[in-house]
Amino acid sequence: MRLHHLHVAYLDHKASSSSSSPAPPSISPSSIPGSAAFPAFSFKCLRPLAPKISLPEPRKMIAPPDFVVPRARNASKLLNYTVQVPAAGTTRWNPSAEQIKVLEMLYRGGMRTPNSVQIERITEELGKYGRIEGKNVFYWFQNHKARERQKQKRAALLTLSTLDPSLLPATANETKEAPEKKEKDVEDGLASCKRRCKAWGDGAGDGDAVVATEAAGGCTDEVTLELFPLHPQGKA
């Protein structure tokens, strides 16, 4: 009954409001399924909507110009350094005329192997005429000595090749006379051996026998005689 009275009051209120001004269409409780379980005033007390949460806008990560400019400058510097790299082979020592003149003057003065102190002084002095290092001075003296030795060897060979040809026959004659001289020396040695055997002989006959024996043997074997023989040689 109470629900019926509320429904009638709602219709009367609707009729009075529709006569004064047009009202927007409303939803009747009967059109909603299960509306009998809820009172009519529950449709008027609507729950307010939740407030809209506004999210912050995503920030755009933009690098400041202070960080960009130095990178560009560094890149340009690296490019310049890359371009300015010296080409291969430029580290080789190219002596100037003044440097060679001073080094040759020192070499003619008697300097052959300078020590570390001398090399340092020479390098400091030659640095006025161009780029030079201590190792360049050291190797220059070593190479100069090697070239001088080669020149001396070539000069000696050239001197031997240009000797007087008249000296060659004399050398050949000396070569031919060498065997004859050797034979003469052998004969002289044999004669001295015979004389030595005669001096040690006890008698004339024994001496002849000893001489004959020595002559037959060619005096090739030396015989050691006793200083005081008990028996004469050749006799028992």
From Swiss-Prot:
Example of a GO MF term: DNA binding
Pfam families, per the entry: Homeodomain
Alphabetized SUPFAM superfamilies for the sequence: Homeodomain-like
Source species, domain of life: Eukaryota
Gene Ontology cellular component list: nucleus
Primary residence: nucleus
Acetylation keyword on record: no
Residues covered by region (Disordered): 169-188
Record's subcellular location: Nucleus
Bias (Basic and acidic residues): 174-187
Keywords for this protein: Developmental protein, DNA-binding, Homeobox, Nucleus, Transcription, Transcription regulation
Role this protein plays: Transcription factor which may be involved in developmental processes.
Protein name: WUSCHEL-related homeobox 4
